[in-house]
A protein has these predicted regions:
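Extreme N-terminal starter segment of soluble prokaryotic enzymes
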Residues: 1-4
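Active-site metal-binding loops of divalent metal-dependent hydrolases
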Residues: 8-9, 28, 242
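Conserved N-terminal subdomain of the carbohydrate kinase-like
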Residues: 11-23, 38-125, 139-143, 295-306
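A short, N-terminal amphipathic alpha-helix
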Residues: 31-46, 195-199
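Short beta-strand scaffold segments in enzyme catalytic cores
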Residues: 34, 86-89, 213-217
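Short, conserved phosphate/pyrophosphate- and ester-handling motifs at nucleotide-, phospho-/glycolipid
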Residues: 36, 176, 240
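Conserved beta-alpha-beta core of the PfkB/ribokinase-like small-molecule kinase fold
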Residues: 123-195, 213
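Conserved phosphate-binding/catalytic region of the ribokinase-like
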Residues: 190-306
Length: 306
């Protein structure tokens, strides 16, 4: 197995200036898994494994979506009760979601159980979960190349010390600019990122900046990329998870320490993947994204960067 992703699987109800959708398939493992498996197929890599929990209301059609790119869903547990549900709204420039309701349902008691055949992947991605659950995943696995961790402001607020401890166990940390400033208590983004990188003792820090792109702090080097420019902004939900899943796939391609050029290429691909997710509600754009469309957008983005 080349990539293992542990995260949430949810039904999302989302509204934005572009419209609305109810009970659409979502969650960090869903977006990350679809993106990662699309790219492992493109790159000729092995399987992407998913670990998560769903309720008895989770449909066969949605399970088929999770495995549509060949992902291994044997680590997805079905528990008695309803699947995790989230309701949110975006306004104006859609920089942040307003959470209307969160119903954890079966996710409230989720304890990750990584199947034996998935315990030694090339890359482990601990998607957005409570730090204690992320630590459990790291206890169960031994990635041969890279461990990655994504997080959010909630865990900084309610589980800061646990988060800092689990950060010290991974090779690459992904958080957004607001979370970096919050962790470091510093409004200067570069200074805050350098402080977080030091406190987390992490080799690579990737800072997501939404419509402003991404900053990566890798060793002593900094990589800065803009977002892919698009006028078709529909639903930002899942863009960060798409980004992380793509990054995991691209970094599963190499061997040994990550080189700067390798990381930059992975960040370019991750940025472009997220731009597709942005253009539809739910996972619709990830389901229809073709290799030809992706490659064309990569070429367009690289021409912008030159």
């Amino acid at each position: 197995m080349d990539v293992l992703i542990v995260g949430s699987i949810a039904y999302d109800s989302v509204s934005s200036p572009a419209g609305a959708v109810t009970h659409a398939l979502g969650g960090s493992a869903t977006y990350g898994g679809l993106a990662s498996s699309f790219h492992t197929n493109r790159l000729g890599l092995g399987t992407v494994g998913l670990v998560g929990v769903v309720g008895t209301d989770f449909t066969d059609e949605d399970r088929a979506v999770l495995t549509s790119n060949g992902a291994d869903a044997s680590g997805i547990e079905t528990a008695e009760g309803e699947t995790f549900r989230w309701e949110g709204a975006y306004h104006g420039a859609m920089a942040e979601a307003e959470t209307k309701a969160t119903h954890l349902n079966v996710f409230e008691h989720f304890q990750p159980n990584v199947p034996e055949h998935a315990q030694e992947p090339k890359v482990t991605l601990c998607a957005n979960l409570h730090p204690a659950l992320q630590a459990s995943v790291l206890d169960q696995t031994k990635a041969s190349r890279l461990t990655m961790l994504d997080s959010m402001n909630l865990w900084i607020t309610i589980a800061r010390e646990e988060l800092l401890e689990v950060m010290k166990r991974v090779d690459l940390l992904i958080i957004n600019d607001g979370e970096v400033r919050m962790l470091a208590d510093d409004e200067n983004l570069v200074r805050a990122a350098q402080a977080v990188k030091t406190m987390a003792k992490v080799a690579t820090l990737v800072v997501k900046r939404g419509e402003h792109g991404v900053l990566a702090f890798h060793g002593d080097e900094i990589i800065a990329l803009p977002a892919f420019p698009t006028s078709n902004v529909c639903d930002p939900t899942g863009c960060g998870d798409t980004f992380a899943g793509t990054l995991a796939a691209y970094l599963a391609l190499g061997e040994g320490p990550i080189e700067r050029d390798e990381l930059r290429a992975a960040l370019v691909a991750s940025t472009v993947s997220a731009s597709f997710t942005l253009e539809s509600f739910g996972v619709a754009a990830l389901q229809t994204m073709s290799e030809e469309a992706f490659d064309a957008r990569i070429d367009e983005f690289e021409s912008i960067l030159r």
